[in-house]
Amino acid sequence: MKRLCVFCGSSPGARPAYRDVAADLGRALARGGFGLVFGGSKVGLMGILADAVLEARGDVVGVIPQALMKKELAHTGLTELRVVASMHERKQTMADLSDGFIALPGGMGTIEELTEVLTWAQLGLHRKPCGLLNVEGYYDRFIGFLDHAVAERFVTPAHRSMIVVASTPDELLEAFRTYQAPIVDKWIDRAAT
């Protein structure tokens, strides 16, 4: 793995722990030799993360749609900033440039980006690791939702296992290094339909 895509908030969030883990993840990525691919903003957790990678002399590629250049305040000090035409192109470009995906705390955009790459994994479009950095239980209810979806037979246990959950950057990156995508022969249980 050379580059990891991180989805996270353009807000710093309510707790200092969110900002701290964004900086910790940035340093861990650089220390581990991973480049960062992210949404290209200099504000919120995105900016904290990118700055930490850059301060640790790591490579950072930002991908931002033209429409968000001013709204999200594009980070101009990156290794590379790619300006694309749309949100769809942003997500596809980020996915194409990355060998795995991590979600830090964030809002609707973060959840949407994460669930899209999980869906792509479920459909067999990629076999890259997808992970949650569950800071102070931020994603506990989302994880509970996934477990509920398994219990209600909307998600298979194999597909549920595609998401790696950790509470520290080092733990998550170690899990990514050893990640083996589950082999799923079918994604619909015909007996249950």
Indicate residue ranges for each PLM-predicted region:
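Active-site/ligand-binding-proximal alpha/beta "capping" segment
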Residues: 90-124, 131, 183-187
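A cross-family phosphate/adenosyl-ligand binding-site feature
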Residues: 1-97, 135-170, 174-175, 179-193
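Flexible, glycine/proline-enriched loop segments at strand-loop-helix junctions
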Residues: 104-105, 129-133, 160-163
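Gly/Pro- and small hydrophobic-enriched strand-loop and loop-to-helix capping segments
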Residues: 59-61, 123-134
